[in-house]
Amino acid sequence: MNISIIVAMSQNLVIGQKNSIPWNIPKDLSWFKKHTIKKSIIMGRKTWESIGRVLPMRQNIVLTRQKNIKNTNVLFVNSISKAIQSALYKNEIMIIGGSNLYNQMLTSANKLYITHIEKYILGDTYFPTYDHLPWKIIFKKKIIEHEKTKNSFYVTFKILKKIT
C-alpha cells in the first residue's frame, strides 16, 4: 500500500488562508483531479468543510473527533489508522490536507505530488518543511500562470518519491 500526499503550496509553504485556498489555478485543479480520481482520499475535517461537497469518483474519508457529522457518501473516522484500514482503493491512498494531517503523515508518505506556486502568498496555514527527508524528483513540469498579464508567475508540478 502506498500513501501519497498531494498539496499545492506557495514559495513560503502557504497552503491556506481563512479555511480556503488563496489562489485559483485551473491547471492545479486538473492536476489534483488526475492524481486523486478512483482513489481513496483522506482529509481532515477543516479540509472537508472548505471543500464543501463530496469529491466524485473517489472514496472520501474524513478524519474528525466530532461525532455529529453525517453524509452518506463520506466515511467519517476518528483515527489515521482507521482511515487507512477503511480505504477501498489500497493501491495508492491520497492525503489531501490539511496542515495537521500533512504534519502527521509526511514521514509515512511514499510520494509527494506538489503544485509549487513560485511566489510569496499571505496565509495562515502552512505545509511542513520536507526537504530534510530523502526525496527524489521523478517528475517536474514548469508553466506560467496568467502569462499575458503583469501578474504572471511560475507554477511547477512535481512528483517526489521517497528514497528508501
UniProtKB/Swiss-Prot annotation:
Task: Report the GO terms under cellular component.
Answer: cytosol
Q: Where does substrate bind?
A: 6-8, 28, 58, 115
Record flagged with keyword Transmembrane helix: no
- Catalytic activity of the protein: (6S)-5,6,7,8-tetrahydrofolate + NADP(+) = 7,8-dihydrofolate + NADPH + H(+)
DHFR domain: from which residue to which, for each copy?
2-162
Recorded hits in PROSITE patterns, A to Z, give: DHFR_1, DHFR_2
Alphabetical UniProt keywords: NADP, One-carbon metabolism, Oxidoreductase
Q: What is its EC number?
A: 1.5.1.3
> Which top EC class is named for this enzyme in its record?
oxidoreductase
Q: Quick one: which residues bind NADP(+)?
A: 7-8, 15-20, 44-47, 63-66, 96-101
Highest rank taxon of the organism: Bacteria
Pathway entry: Cofactor biosynthesis; tetrahydrofolate biosynthesis; 5,6,7,8-tetrahydrofolate from 7,8-dihydrofolate: step 1/1
Annotated GO molecular function terms are:
dihydrofolate reductase activity; NADP binding
What's this chain's function?
A: Key enzyme in folate metabolism. Catalyzes an essential reaction for de novo glycine and purine synthesis, and for DNA precursor synthesis.
Q: Per the similarity annotation, which family is this?
A: Belongs to the dihydrofolate reductase family.
- Name by which UniProt lists this protein: Dihydrofolate reductase
**The organism of origin for this protein:** Buchnera aphidicola subsp. Baizongia pistaciae (strain Bp)
Please name the taxonomic classification of the source: Bacteria, Pseudomonadati, Pseudomonadota, Gammaproteobacteria, Enterobacterales
